[in-house]
């Protein structure tokens, strides 16, 4: 993703600036502008849009927002159909969603390049940018597991969560879920794909903020 950002900025041939590997320390607001103070310098802008992703809550607090909710990361693993099996999916295939769960469920997505993605599952990740199954951050884990909203989410979805973890480490169980929609799929039809991490905004009661958290 970072490489694509660099390529896009260079292709625009504009006055854009791209600064990587900098930590935001705080924000200063004046009548004329907003200053972003990082560990490498200060940047000033008339208008500022912060797209924080998995760090959105931490950046909001650094900007003085009294945010009770907390971002907790959930990793989603994907499989891909092999080239020989792509003919089995002609369009998007989704399961009927369960409104009791904050996740959509495993589905099939035809990509623009012809690839067919199958997934994702949804498992708690021990690192906010934990795209690997064994990625770990002490800070992120402590931050999530000392928040009561995390435990309330866990306990209210215990069986769902256990099944998701089992599927994360078992290709056979993942395939079994896919076969509910396409029974003819076999182990040879799927191969490991990418993974992503969802920034789930959790309230203290374990409820998820599915859309926007707006503060005036």
Residue ranges: model-predicted function:
Residues 18-20, 50, 118, 191-192:
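General beta-strand structural signal in soluble alpha/beta enzymes
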Residues 15-17, 66-71, 187-189:
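A short alpha-helix-loop-beta-strand transition element characteristic
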Residues 139, 144-216:
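C-terminal catalytic lobe of FAD-dependent flavoproteins
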Residues 9-17, 181-184:
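A structural motif corresponding to the C-terminal end of an alpha-helix
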Residues 14-34:
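A conserved short coil-to-beta-strand element within the FAD-binding core of flavoproteins
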Residues 1-7, 19, 163-173:
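Short beta-strand to alpha-helix junction loop
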Residues 27-137:
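Flavin-dependent oxidoreductases
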């Amino acid at each position: 993703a970072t490489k694509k950002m660099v390529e896009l900025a260079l292709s625009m041939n504009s006055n854009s600036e791209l600064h990587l590997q900098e930590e935001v320390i705080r924000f200063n607001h004046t009548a004329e502008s907003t200053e972003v103070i990082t560990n490498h310098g200060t940047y000033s802008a008339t208008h500022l849009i912060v797209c924080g992703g998995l760090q959105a809550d931490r950046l909001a607090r650094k900007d003085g927002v009294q945010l009770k909710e907390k971002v907790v990361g959930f990793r989603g693993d994907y499989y891909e159909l092999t080239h020989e099996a792509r003919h089995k999916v002609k369009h998007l295939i989704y399961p009927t969603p369960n409104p009791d769960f904050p996740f959509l469920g495993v589905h099939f997505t035809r990509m623009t390049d012809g690839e067919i993605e199958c997934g994702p599952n949804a498992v708690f990740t021990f690192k906010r940018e934990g795209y690997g199954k064994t990625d770990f951050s002490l800070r992120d884990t402590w931050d999530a597991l000392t928040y009561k909203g995390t435990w309330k989410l866990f306990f209210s979805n215990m069986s769902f969560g256990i099944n998701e973890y089992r599927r994360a480490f078992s290709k056979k169980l993942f395939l079994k879920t896919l076969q509910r929609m396409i029974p003819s799929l076999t182990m040879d039809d799927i191969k490991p794909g990418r993974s992503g991490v969802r920034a789930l905004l959790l309230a203290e009661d374990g409820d998820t903020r599915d859309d926007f958290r707006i503060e005036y």
